[in-house]
Regions:
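Acidic, glycine-rich two-metal-ion catalytic cores of nucleic acid-processing enzymes
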Residues: 132-215
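N-terminal leader/targeting and assembly helices and adjacent pre-domain segments
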Residues: 1-156, 164-165, 212-215
Length: 215
């Protein structure tokens, strides 16, 4: 279910590292409030654009996979809308109940924090502090990128199921001993398609499978 998403995430992980490393080579003598604002703004515009491209690919793949699973479960094959860029934008603009924030607003908060940390590092002429700030910012952006990638897949999957006529889904937890208590308790529970509980934590990889018509 997340195989394509994981491949796209590997691309994004390398891109994030490259983008923040590029910012790290700027010398202290080149930094001022205007330059820092421009550099960090341009950085996050690029990062969000790259995420958008890959979220769209992941959503389309999830749509196709969900349709195939629904057909395998006995639902009639039919044409259903495929996610487009507008779909991804609308999804990212919605409130996320797991993260507790809005995607773009959180990206701007991360940018502002990074800009402030860079200016503080310059004030103290601390290259170590500068590099640490970039590393923390990269890790935080990676965390947000990962979380929203998995949520994109989940949202596109559920929507495709519903469009295919699926009425109920079954929660499947990967029972490897590392699962959380909530996910363990939800394993194999059946939920109406419109009443599936939010994932209990970030980066949850529990799957939702269509309940066959005969059930």
């Amino acid at each position: 279910m997340y195989r394509t998403a994981d491949k796209l995430l590997e691309q994004l992980k390398k891109l994030i590292r490259r983008e923040f490393n590029r910012l790290g080579i700027i010398g202290f003598d080149e930094l001022n409030a205007f330059r820092v604002t421009k550099e960090t703004t341009d950085l996050f515009i690029r990062l969000m654009a790259e995420n958008m491209k890959r979220y769209l690919l992941a959503a389309k793949n999830a749509n196709a996979n969900a349709k195939a699973l629904a057909i395998a479960a006995g639902f009639v094959d039919r044409e259903i809308p495929v996610p487009d860029e507008a779909w991804v934008r609308a999804f990212l603009a919605s409130y996320n109940f797991v993260s507790g924030y809005l995607y773009e607003q959180e990206a701007e908060r991360k940018r502002l924090r990074l800009a402030e940390q860079i200016m503080t590092a310059k004030e103290y002429q601390s290259r170590t502090q500068y590099n640490d700030s970039l590393r923390r910012a990269a890790n935080l952006w990676w965390s947000q990128t990962l979380h929203y990638m998995l949520d994109t897949v989940d949202s596109a999957t559920l929507e495709a199921y519903e469009l295919m006529g699926v009425k109920k889904v079954e929660w499947h937890t990967h029972m490897d001993g590392k699962e959380c208590k909530v996910c363990r308790e939800r394993h194999l529970k059946v939920y109406p398609i419109g009443d599936v509980p939010p994932k209990p934590h970030r980066n949850c990889r529990c799957r939702l499978m269509p309940v066959p018509i005969k059930k």
